């Protein structure tokens, strides 16, 4: 444990948490995002590896159940910097709350993958994979496009299912439909690994660095990582916010 907390990416994110975590009445949001990120990763990433390994449809079913369960357990946290950015753009939260939530999301991500590795080794389970792309197999342009479009579709679905459509009043129905949208994106826009979540892309990359020779946790050194998961992802989220703003009359960064 001491060695884990000696790596500078872990120190940086923990420092951000210390600064942003106690922000007044947003403490509950911080805890919800932290716990929600942990639950989301465990319940959704384990589908097809720890549970539902018997076939494609079983994997789909367990993943959908994980989407619903993760949201229900914690009470609907964002668990995604791109989604949190859309709420900032549409005036639903302030900059300080944005930082508070994102720091908690990162803390959850950077802690959960090593914990899952330890759990998998202890119970002799296969370690699940995460969102990544191989430049030798996938063009950079394709990865950018897929990540941006998938994030755009996810955010539009969240707006419609949670704020506009009648189904928003039925929790199980709207979360199940959200799971369908996520699975659709995973199948159709896979060039980037389809994170649809900058935190997942970067925390998984940090975790993979510890699996390499030397075992050091490090932020990705390739700029293409940040272009794909952050620039493309945030662009998709902001375009979805702008589109929703134009359709609903809501101010965009007003």
Question: What residue spans do the PLM features occupy?
Answer:
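Membrane-interface helix-loop junctions and terminal tails of multi-pass membrane proteins
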Residues: 1-254
């Amino acid at each position: 444990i001491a060695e884990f907390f000696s790596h500078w990416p872990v120190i940086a994110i923990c420092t951000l948490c210390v600064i942003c975590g106690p922000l007044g009445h947003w403490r509950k949001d911080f805890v919800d995002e932290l716990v929600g990120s942990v639950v989301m990763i465990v319940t959704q990433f384990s589908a097809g590896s720890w549970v539902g390994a018997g076939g494609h449809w079983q994997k789909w079913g367990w993943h959908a159940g994980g989407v619903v369960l993760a949201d229900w357990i914690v009470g609907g946290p964002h668990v995604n910097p791109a989604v949190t950015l859309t709420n900032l753009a549409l005036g639903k939260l302030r900059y300080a709350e944005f930082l508070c939530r994102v720091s908690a999301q990162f803390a959850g991500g950077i802690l959960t993958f090593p914990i899952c590795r330890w759990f998998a080794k202890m119970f002799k389970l296969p370690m699940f994979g995460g969102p990544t792309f191989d430049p030798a197999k996938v063009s950079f342009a394709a990865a950018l496009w897929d990540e941006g479009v998938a994030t755009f579709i996810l955010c539009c679905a969240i707006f419609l299912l949670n704020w506009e459509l009648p189904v928003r009043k039925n929790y199980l129905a709207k979360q199940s439909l959200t799971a369908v949208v996520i699975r659709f994106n995973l199948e159709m826009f896979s060039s980037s690994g389809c994170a649809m979540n900058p935190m997942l892309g970067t925390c998984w990359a940090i975790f993979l660095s510890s699996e390499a020779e030397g075992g050091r946790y490090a932020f990705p050194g390739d700029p293409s990582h940040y272009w794909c998961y952050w620039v493309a992802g945030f662009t998709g989220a902001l375009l979805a916010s702008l589109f929703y703003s134009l359709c609903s009359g809501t101010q965009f960064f007003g």
